[in-house]
UniProtKB/Swiss-Prot annotation:
Pathway where this protein functions: Phospholipid metabolism; CDP-diacylglycerol biosynthesis; CDP-diacylglycerol from sn-glycerol 3-phosphate: step 1/3
Lineage of origin: Bacteria, Pseudomonadati, Pseudomonadota, Gammaproteobacteria, Alteromonadales
HAMAP family per record: Glyc3P_acyltrans
Protein name: Glycerol-3-phosphate acyltransferase
Topology in membrane: Peripheral membrane protein
UniProt organism field: Shewanella baltica (strain OS155 / ATCC BAA-1091)
Length: 807
């Protein structure tokens, strides 16, 4: 290799500086990987390449990593900084042997034998000039831009045409000290290390580019030859008394309606547009947990992303983030309502496949869709779908629609070899464009049909939207889940493949709820959501600025010292910083007062801000319930607080998809936190410290509307034990409307009929709606709920239930 200060390399670096734009994966290798700045470091690359090393040199200078041109000097040892697995491919003839490169591996290992204190980190580095996966029927373009083993001439063309799409990916470091101690330092180990590195680079390329793309028409013909589709076409012909040719044409029409038409060229163009869009809209996008997903891809998992659904922006945001995190954007299941011009064709070429809201018993459509989904899994394409079935209008997670999850489960049961893993994804925003529309719809206005004019209308409103949040939750591997739920599932299916197992539907329901729980476990507590939570807990949606900052400091400390889960993310900075962020986004207003500034939510925005509060209400609902127990009792034993929370938690879990593993332990941790912060003292009982009562009262207010709902339900059950489930839902909803009208409750979810339906299902499951119900339990929970209400609210509920009962 020429010296790094030679005229040739200087010229090459100057050319690349103007032609090449490099994206680093991950963005911060020191934070995301196991790199240790105090230990010597060497790079391992697949192929010796002057242009690759020049590009790497630019990046290492920006990241503060050692330059690939500098020799590795450690403990008196001088070695090359870059180790390659193979030499450059010549324009003509054969590539030289790998012996010189294996010698480098052996030298690095050998010095560890001589110097026991030495530990060199070997960091794999992959470079990609463009990320085209190629096609099954590839053309001359593939020959010109052969990316894996290009000659210098092809590399020049790649830099010229694809230099703006260069990716450099760093991987976790390998300790050569560990390798030397565990496996030795001879040539055999050097060969083994090189083999492992080759496998790593091959897998890494697959993660970055994805599987080859099929020819769409060839894919259709392949699907139509499948056993299940041939059978479905025959049944369609027989049932509708048409020819098989006509039924086949219908199946092709369905495929054309459903199937994606992924275009790498469009994705590259979209990447530029979306970079401009995000920079215009957001001051930053916060990402947590991407490395675990990248590792799942690397380990050969079939990935199914299951995000929550807040906004139409969700379709773009997750794909964009995955692209920049070194993964292939997934094929996205989009509602057929989005298949309008020009968005529909663009979404389709960006990887969207379209699904009808209802299959309406259409067996042929069902068979076509199922076969297409199976094919995506079989070929290794990652998939994304929204299990809620639509965008949440309240900010809370919706009850999951199980159709897509059931189809995914069925694909596993039909024999996918690779592990299929669901990755729950929490998507959050400091500003959701559609919030105002959502509240119009909740108040009875008809939902507008999606159209190009809505797109233009949305573009006109683009502004400062603060930050976005993408948190990847705990993955669920379906084969492991099935082993847990039905240990003999493989044997059962082998014995009778056509028989639907009795455990399948309950297992799908449990899986769907676990996905939603894992989404909420990965929630992002941001400046907007936290400030909304505090201000909406006050009577006038306003608070003195210093008190607001103090309350936010309490919440931030709580989330950090008693973390809800390890997947949850918490805003950086203190309460003062969070308030300032919210004011800069115009979410809140501040007015001067002789005694100090007051921060408030404008009356016209109060209902809209409940959306953001609801994004994270589950993080604080148990601490809020604990605070309510403390503030409504002068003294209360610790165990009584634990018991009250245990009574309400099953309902909270059903309503808010909560995932606290050990509820008593969590309650005790929160109580210990309150004591540590000086809010509460404990002798034989727990007592609130008077000067901190206001902080606990504010926290307690966040659970008040939830307790009012439970008080309505349990007062009705206590007065009318024989009440049917449907009757309980309708009566609870009517009483909620009455309570809201009398006490000014405006939160949309308080009147949500579906919420009362969810609670009634859980009540039946817990035995509170059964004929042999334990009335003492119902009366106890009723009394607990009543004791935690304001007297006026309690009086309204008790009087209304009694009056209704006497009527």
């Amino acid at each position: 290799m020429p010296k790094h200060d030679s005229l040739w390399l200087k010229s090459l670096r100057w050319i690349q500086k103007h032609l090449v734009h490099t994206i680093v994966v991950p963005q911060d290798p020191f934070a995301d990987l196991n790199l240790d700045a105090s230990r010597p470091l060497a790079y391992v690359m697949k192929t010796e390449s002057l242009s690759d090393i020049a590009a790497l040199s630019e990046i290492t200078a920006k990241l503060g990593l050692p330059s690939p041109y500098e020799p590795l000097v450690a403990n008196g040892v001088i070695a090359p900084r870059v180790v390659c697995l193979q030499g450059r491919k010549p324009l003509f003839g054969e590539r030289a042997g790998n012996e010189p490169f294996l010698e480098c591996f052996m030298r690095l290992l050998a010095v560890h034998k001589e110097r026991p204190e030495l530990d060199i980190q070997l960091v794999p580095v992959s470079l990609y000039w463009g990320r085209t996966p190629g096609k099954e029927d590839d053309t001359m373009k593939a020959a010109v831009f052969e990316r894996e083993n290009p000659t210098w001439l092809r590399k020049c063309l790649m830099i010229l045409f694809l230099g703006r799409h260069n990716f450099v990916q760093f991987s976790n470091a390998v300790s050569l000290r560990y390798m030397a101690d565990e496996h030795g330092t001879d040539m055999g180990i050097a060969h083994k290390l090189a083999r492992v590195a080759r496998v790593h680079f091959r897998r890494q390329r697959k993660v970055m580019t994805g599987p080859v793309l099929p020819n769409r028409q060839a894919l259709f013909h392949s699907l139509l030859k499948s056993e299940s589709l041939r059978k479905a076409i025959q049944e369609e012909a027989a049932n509708k008394k048409i020819s098989e040719t006509q039924a086949r044409e219908t199946a092709i029409e369905y495929l054309d309606e459903i199937a994606a038409d992924y275009s790498d060229s469009l994705v590259r163009i979209a990447e530029r547009f979306l970079t401009w869009l995000w920079n215009k809209l957001y001051s930053g996008i916060n990402i947590k947990g991407a490395e675990q997903v990248r590792q799942l891809h690397h380990d050969g998992h079939e990935i199914v992303y299951v995000p929550c659904h807040r906004s139409h922006m969700d379709y773009l945001l997750l794909s964009y983030i995955l692209y920049y995190q070194g993964m292939v954007p997934p094929h996205i299941a989009a509602g057929i309502n989005l298949n309008f011009w020009p968005a529909g064709p663009m979404f389709r070429r960006g990887g969207a496949f379209f699904i009808r809201r209802s299959f309406n018993g259409n067996k042929l459509y069902t068979a076509v869709f199922r076969e297409y989904l199976d094919q995506l899994f079989a070929k290794g394409y990652s998939v994304e779908y929204f299990s809620e079935g639509g965008r949440s209008r309240t900010g809370r997670l919706l009850a999951p629609k199980t159709g897509m999850i059931a189809m995914t489960m069925n694909s596993v049961l039909r024999g996918i070899e690779r592990p299929v893993t669901l990755v729950p994804v929490y998507l959050g925003y400091d500003h959701v464009m559609e919030v105002a529309t959502y509240h119009k719809e909740l108040s009875g206005k008809k939902k507008k049909k999606e159209s190009v004019w809505q797109v233009f209308g949305a573009i006109r409103k683009l502004g400062n939207f603060g930050q976005g949040y993408v948190n990847f939750g705990e993955p669920i591997t379906l084969q492991n889940f099935l082993n847990e739920r039905a240990p003999n599932w493989r044997t059962e299916l082998a014995d009778d493949p056509e028989q639907k197992p009795s455990w399948l539907t309950p297992a799908v329901n449990v899986l769907a709820n676990r996905v939603m729980t894992n989404i909420n476990d990965a929630a992002a507590a941001s400046s907007v959501t936290l400030t909304s939570l505090v201000l909406l807990a006050t009577d006038q949606n306003a608070l003195e600025r210093s008190l607001l900052e103090r309350q936010l400091d309490l919440y931030l400390t709580l989330l950090k010292k008693v973390p809800y889960t390890t997947y949850t993310s918490v805003a950086e900075g203190d309460g003062k910083h969070l308030v300032q962020q919210g004011l800069e986004l115009n979410k809140f207003v501040v007015c001067a007062d002789p005694l100090g500034e007051i921060v408030s939510i404008e009356a016209s925005q109060a209902v809209s801000m409940t959306y953001y509060r609801n994004n994270i209400i589950h993080l604080f609902i148990v601490p809020s319930l604990i605070a309510s127990c403390l503030t409504h009792n002068k003294q209360i034993p610790r165990q009584q607080v634990v018991s009250i929370v245990a009574d309400f938690y099953p309902l909270l879990k059903a309503e808010l998809f909560m995932g606290i593993k050990d509820v008593p332990a969590y309650v005790n941790q929160v109580l210990d936190f309150f004591i540590e912060q000086g809010l509460v003292v404990e002798t034989d009982t727990l007592t609130v410290v008077p000067e901190h009562t206001s902080q606990l009262l504010l926290l307690a207010s966040s659970v008040s509307e939830t307790l009012q709902r439970y008080a309505i339900i349990f007062n009705l059950l206590a007065n009318r034990p024989k009440m049917e489930r449907s009757e309980l839902e309708s009566e609870s909803h009517l009483l909620a409307q009455r309570l809201g009208a009398l006490h000014g409750i405006t939160a949309p979810e308080f009147y949500d009929k579906k919420l009362y339906g969810t609670l009634s299902v859980k009540l039946k499951e817990l035995g509170y709606l059964a004929d042999n119900q334990d009335k003492s339990n119902i009366n106890r929970i009723r009394d607990q709920a009543n004791s935690l209400l304001r007297p006026s609210v309690k009086q309204t509920i008790v009087a209304s239930v009694t009056a209704e009962h006497t009527v």
